[in-house]
Amino acid sequence: MISSKFGIGQQVRHKLLGYLGVIIDVDPEYSLEKPSLEEISADDSLRRSPWYYVVMEDEDGKPVHTYLAEAQLGYEISPVHPEQPKLDELSASIKKQLKTPRLRN
């Protein structure tokens, strides 16, 4: 069984680039059809670890969807980011949806 460090709705930081992001989905292992060289290293263990769909912002504040390995992400301690309030709102919205049960009918 593969366990993941991060959960859906959690804010994270890219370890190398320092970008703030919000996790919107998790795969137990790499699941895209054709990995690019930037996404997969020569070490196959990276491919077998959890991968995350993460929303980040570009320099203009527009959302950027990324697919990142668990090894590329670190915990974000601060829950509030005045420079990127949209990501704070996205994180809060996702967490609220996960806590609130939905009626199907």
Swiss-Prot record:
Family statement drawn from the similarity comment of this UniProt entry: Belongs to the HspQ family.
InterPro entries per the UniProt record, alphabetical: Hemimethylated_DNA-bd_dom, Hemimethylated_DNA-bd_sf, HspQ
Superkingdom of this protein's organism: Bacteria
Keyword entries, A-Z: Cytoplasm, Stress response
Biased composition (Basic residues): 96-105
Pfam families noted in UniProt: YccV-like
Main location: cytoplasm
Name used for this protein in its record: Heat shock protein HspQ
Keyword DNA repair: no
Subcellular localization, as worded in the UniProt entry: Cytoplasm
GO BP term, pick one: response to heat
Known function: Involved in the degradation of certain denaturated proteins, including DnaA, during heat shock stress.
Cytoplasm as UniProt keyword: yes
